[in-house]
């Protein structure tokens, strides 16, 4: 082991034996002495979490039509422009996607409309 390695091991062992208060004091001294900030390392470590993109496209899924199938069929027709037969088939085939790849506001609005008609709806 070289002299530099020995010094590093000794320093590490000394730090390991310190109390938390002493370690915090050491950090403060090192920040002042070397003009660095321990917070910068935390900010760099947090950066990858910000890289996660917010979802922009949503699917509205009809899980069940509930007690009022007719009202749900009407709501599906109004929202999708489907004919009566197609809307009825979609509702009866639940769970089924009503609309796919729409923005959050439209998805929330459609969910509210379908729930008011009595449907059980999910957004993914």
Swiss-Prot record:
Gene3D superfamilies: 3.30.1390.10, Single helix bin. One of its GO terms (biological process) is translation. InterPro entries: Ribosomal_bL12, Ribosomal_bL12_C, Ribosomal_bL12_C/ClpS-like, Ribosomal_bL12_oligo, Ribosomal_bL12_oligo_N_sf. SUPFAM superfamilies: ClpS-like (SSF54736), Ribosomal protein L7/12, oligomerisation (N-terminal) domain (SSF48300). It comes from the Bacteria. Pfam families: Ribosomal_L12, Ribosomal_L12_N. Keywords: Ribonucleoprotein, Ribosomal protein. The keyword tRNA processing does not apply. GO terms for cellular component: cytosolic large ribosomal subunit. GO terms for molecular function: mRNA binding; structural constituent of ribosome. Belongs to the bacterial ribosomal protein bL12 family. Homodimer. Part of the ribosomal stalk of the 50S ribosomal subunit. Forms a multimeric L10(L12)X complex, where L10 forms an elongated spine to which 2 to 4 L12 dimers bind in a sequential fashion. Binds GTP-bound translation factors. Forms part of the ribosomal stalk which helps the ribosome interact with GTP-bound translation factors. Is thus essential for accurate translation. This is Large ribosomal subunit protein bL12. The gene is rplL.
